[in-house]
Amino acid sequence: PVGIGISHARETLYIDLDSQSQETLDVLKEFLLSPNYNFIGHNIFFDGAILQAQLGQWMNWTACTYGLFRQLANEGWVGQKYGLKQAQLDLLGWDTRGDVELDEWLVAAGVVKNYEHVFSKWSAEERLADFRAGGSIRVDKSRMSLAPPNILGYYCGLDAYSTYKLYTEVLLPAIHRLPAKFQEVFTWYHSLFITNVELLVQQQLRGVYVDVGQLSQFETKTRILIDDYSGQFRRHPEV
């Protein structure tokens, strides 16, 4: 990673790793691996794997807002998006996503898909105009680390801030409003879900990957069964 965003109740910060001294990096590593702090993230399968590879140890992850968003969306629909940018709009009520400034910098700099074959002859202004109008330009987010710290840091900080807000102001209150018998499930949340994510990360770092094709087939079959049983329930004469 080129930087890390951290947020809590009082402040949010972004740490650009390339500009830090070794002493600062050592303190940061000690903080991230401390058992005295609880960490949350949006899709800790990704963030946790990246940090595990860099730190050599699994952090004290206690919640994944991406996982909770999906697990609590009992009335979700096919094609629903659960990414953090969508949650910023749908659950936090933001007017715009937190990556707009970053996306526009990348577009202006030519960090877009098919740049060499299609968009290299376009000026930065033409690319931005097309992007803002919802045209054919697509940002290449896989190379967003090319953005300077003042752009990338602001985006990363907003991600950290919105993840914290999503957890404390939306997801936790939703759990607390559940009937007692359902709240009991979340007392086992760490052992049921977080440890499974850790296992998947440890396997992947050792070359054992999830069979995504089989998993997708299983998801499709499960969705068909759920829809079938839901239909039977709604058609029941006593419902």
What are these regions (language model features)?
Residues 169-188, 231-239:
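Surface-exposed helix-capping loop/turn segments at secondary-structure junctions
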Residues 80, 144, 148, 152-158, ...:
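Secondary-structure capping and boundary motifs in well-ordered enzyme cores
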Residues 188-239:
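Extended, well-ordered alpha-helical scaffold/bundle regions in very large, multi-domain proteins
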Residues 2-178, 200:
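Active-site-proximal helix-loop-helix substrate-binding element of RNase H-like nuclease domains
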